[in-house]
Amino acid sequence: MKLLHLSDLHIGKSLGNFSFLEDQKYVLDQILDIIKVKKIEAVMIAGDIFDTSVASSEALDLYNYFIEKIIFEIKIPVLAISGNHDSAKRLDINKRFYKTNKYYLAGEYTEDVVTLEDENGPIHFFLLPFMSLAKGRILFGEDVSDFTDLYKKALENYSYKDRNVLITHCYATELSESLEKEYNEGQKPLTIGGSDFCDAELFVNFDYVALGHLHSAHYVYDPKIRYSGTFMPYSFDKKDVNKSVTIVDLGKNSLDIEKIPIKLLRKFEVRTGFFDDLISDPASDSYIKFILEDKATIENAMAKFKKKFPNAVLINYASRSVFAMENSEININIENKSTIELFEDFIEYKDKRKLTSEERSVLEDVIGAINEG
């Protein structure tokens, strides 16, 4: 059976004042074409369908458009679950109607197993939506201390007869890995306190595991335990990542994976330089983050940029503060140094220059006034 694995659609997401709905429809239409061309037989959506628990009417309309195209026009089933961004109860509204039209949706956890058949026999899909640890303790007992415990309980009575696919939304990892490295793009942590992580080895008995939650496409522990990632970047730190959707061809005793590249409506760009140079760049409709190297604030910089770059999103000043320097640490020796010497070291570290005599004089006056009380 040829399956399409999607996750983390985040329908209705915005960046600054910019809604991504137009960009998302552009990609969803590509996905509809992929479903037809590749002769997909079922679509899996592993959570975070919407970006917020109370999705806008526009976001609901776009998702309904996508689902209705699949189930009514292409006429293949959809199997979907809620993620930690979704409202499980809202998703479950009209669940019985959806099911009669082969849209199998698990908002709240109910041990849903959906069986589809191909020429090789049945495939059982276990729909295991996101649930909090608090919810897990209600369902499985107070001894659930983390997500590994939760999944052990959820899977302990599962029968692995025939071929089996798990669709779930979690942070699966090899416990030997560095556990923090995947969080980005403003992803919500799954818990406040406690462990967000689940041992991926728990999933090895499934023939395929369709994961959602992490935004980069990759596998964990075994190539059959896989994140599809988002179908478009949702932050500038992912601007250079080539986005894709994942096709899974599950045979009787075989598994083939194919990633299909996605074309974006607009690029994400980070442009660094002086204002006068950047404003001279060719016009673009890309989403742009500007990092200005000017020392002085440029008056109405964003308004000026938007005349040429209508999707300018953000302006940062490279030298405005040390906190604007991403992924760096301050490395200054502070032992046995005066306040003036510390300022000198800091300016040299931050701006790669020496204090001027005028700046030094002002600092001496300020420090003297402070010391005098």
Q: For the regions a protein language model found, what residue spans apply to each?
A:
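Accessory, non-catalytic peripheral segments of nucleic-acid enzymes
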Residues: 37, 42, 249-373
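Catalytic-core regions built around general acid/base machinery
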Residues: 62-74, 195-205
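Short, surface-exposed connector motifs at secondary-structure boundaries
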Residues: 71-80, 283-287
